[in-house]
């Protein structure tokens, strides 16, 4: 799921993804936006 958070590295997506999916969230930074997924 892409979320509306800008990023330059996946670390910036860590907290918003955990807020969305809980402690087992995965995160990527793609095209300057965070992508979250459940693991």
Curated annotation (Swiss-Prot):
<comment type="similarity">
    <text>Belongs to the short scorpion toxin superfamily. Potassium channel inhibitor family. Alpha-KTx 02 subfamily.</text>
</comment>
<protein>
    <recommendedName>
        <fullName>Potassium channel toxin alpha-KTx 2.24</fullName>
    </recommendedName>
</protein>
<dbReference type="GO" id="GO:0090729">
    <property type="term" value="F:toxin activity"/>
</dbReference>
<keyword id="KW-0528">Neurotoxin</keyword>
<dbReference type="GO" id="GO:0015459">
    <property type="term" value="F:potassium channel regulator activity"/>
</dbReference>
<keyword id="KW-0800">Toxin</keyword>
<feature type="disulfide bond">
    <location>
        <begin position="7"/>
        <end position="29"/>
    </location>
</feature>
<dbReference type="InterPro" id="IPR036574">
    <property type="entry name" value="Scorpion_toxin-like_sf"/>
</dbReference>
<feature type="site" description="Aromatic residue of the functional dyad">
    <location>
        <position position="37"/>
    </location>
</feature>
<keyword id="KW-0632">Potassium channel impairing toxin</keyword>
<keyword id="KW-1015">Disulfide bond</keyword>
<keyword id="KW-0872">Ion channel impairing toxin</keyword>
<feature type="disulfide bond">
    <location>
        <begin position="13"/>
        <end position="34"/>
    </location>
</feature>
<dbReference type="Pfam" id="PF00451">
    <property type="entry name" value="Toxin_2"/>
</dbReference>
<keyword id="KW-1220">Voltage-gated potassium channel impairing toxin</keyword>
<feature type="disulfide bond">
    <location>
        <begin position="17"/>
        <end position="36"/>
    </location>
</feature>
<comment type="function">
    <text>Blocks human voltage-gated potassium (Kv) channels Kv1.1/KCNA, Kv1.2/KCNA2 and Kv1.3/KCNA3. Exhibits high affinity for Kv1.2/KCNA2 and selectivity over Kv1.1/KCNA and Kv1.3/KCNA3.</text>
</comment>
<feature type="site" description="Basic residue of the functional dyad">
    <location>
        <position position="28"/>
    </location>
</feature>
<dbReference type="GO" id="GO:0008200">
    <property type="term" value="F:ion channel inhibitor activity"/>
</dbReference>
<dbReference type="InterPro" id="IPR001947">
    <property type="entry name" value="Scorpion_toxinS_K_inh"/>
</dbReference>
<dbReference type="GO" id="GO:0005576">
    <property type="term" value="C:extracellular region"/>
</dbReference>
<keyword id="KW-0582">Pharmaceutical</keyword>
<keyword id="KW-0964">Secreted</keyword>
């Amino acid at each position: 799921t892409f979320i509306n958070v800008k990023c330059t590295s996946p670390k910036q997506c860590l907290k918003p993804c955990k807020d969305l999916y809980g402690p087992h969230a995965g995160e990527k930074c793609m095209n300057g936006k965070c992508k979250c997924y459940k693991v």
